């Protein structure tokens, strides 16, 4: 079992990271929160969850143990798989998600793509008691937008559309939504564009 991977950050997109460990590249699916945390770093450490199925072996990477713990709680809920859990953690920071579950805010949770009202309610019912112990741990929230690297709008557009297609959305509607967001907020960093797009697609 892989607990974590530490090494050179060889490749990074809003949806995946490749860590070079002594010449071996480990590709891991990541959330936007982890992307924000490791963006711009030469070396990094990702805590790993291994999803092993008959037809696939997939790694999910997290910048800290708290995000991984919340991910594991999410996938313990019936109907929530790895990609859906990652999408939830891309739309909401761990601190925001803890707050949503603690306050039973199903309406906010169902704004995440792929989460209907029934699934949102199931997440809250199943995790409310389990998540209470994590509230203080993740209260620190996510990285401030001011610390994120700024990119030209075209580059942001390309990265955002690429990330959305990797998450399973069709390219054409993704492009349309991303362009609309950049028209409203030309200086928005890529992770903000993707978060907004996830709520509109």
Curated annotation (Swiss-Prot):
Give the region (Domain II) as residue ranges. Answer: 64-142
Spell out the subunit comment: Homotetramer. Forms an RuvA(8)-RuvB(12)-Holliday junction (HJ) complex. HJ DNA is sandwiched between 2 RuvA tetramers; dsDNA enters through RuvA and exits via RuvB. An RuvB hexamer assembles on each DNA strand where it exits the tetramer. Each RuvB hexamer is contacted by two RuvA subunits (via domain III) on 2 adjacent RuvB subunits; this complex drives branch migration. In the full resolvosome a probable DNA-RuvA(4)-RuvB(12)-RuvC(2) complex forms which resolves the HJ.
Please indicate which superkingdom the organism of origin belongs to.
Bacteria
Q: What is this protein called?
A: Holliday junction branch migration complex subunit RuvA
Q: What is the lineage of its organism?
A: Bacteria, Pseudomonadati, Bacteroidota, Bacteroidia, Bacteroidales
SMART domains assigned: HhH1 (SM00278)
What organism is recorded for this protein? Bacteroides thetaiotaomicron (strain ATCC 29148 / DSM 2079 / JCM 5827 / CCUG 10774 / NCTC 10582 / VPI-5482 / E50)
Q: Where is this region: Flexible linker?
A: 143-151
**Alphabetized CDD domains for the sequence:** UBA_RuvA_C
Region Domain III: list its residue ranges. Answer: 152-201
May I have one GO cellular component term? Answer: Holliday junction helicase complex
Gene from which the chain derives? ruvA
Could you tell me where this protein is found in the cell? Cytoplasm
Any matching Pfam family: RuvA_N
- Which stretches does the entry tag as region Domain I? 1-63
Which InterPro entries does the record associate with it? DNA_helicase_Holl-junc_RuvA_I, Hlx-hairpin-Hlx_DNA-bd_motif, NA-bd_OB-fold, RuvA, RuvA_2-like, RuvA_C, RuvA_C_sf
Q: Any notes on this protein's domains? A: Has three domains with a flexible linker between the domains II and III and assumes an 'L' shape. Domain III is highly mobile and contacts RuvB.
The family this protein is said to belong to: Belongs to the RuvA family.
Q: What does this protein do?
A: The RuvA-RuvB-RuvC complex processes Holliday junction (HJ) DNA during genetic recombination and DNA repair, while the RuvA-RuvB complex plays an important role in the rescue of blocked DNA replication forks via replication fork reversal (RFR). RuvA specifically binds to HJ cruciform DNA, conferring on it an open structure. The RuvB hexamer acts as an ATP-dependent pump, pulling dsDNA into and through the RuvAB complex. HJ branch migration allows RuvC to scan DNA until it finds its consensus sequence, where it cleaves and resolves the cruciform DNA.
UniProt-listed GO biological process terms: DNA recombination; DNA repair; SOS response
A GO molecular-function descriptor = four-way junction DNA binding
Keywords on record? Cytoplasm, DNA damage, DNA recombination, DNA repair, DNA-binding
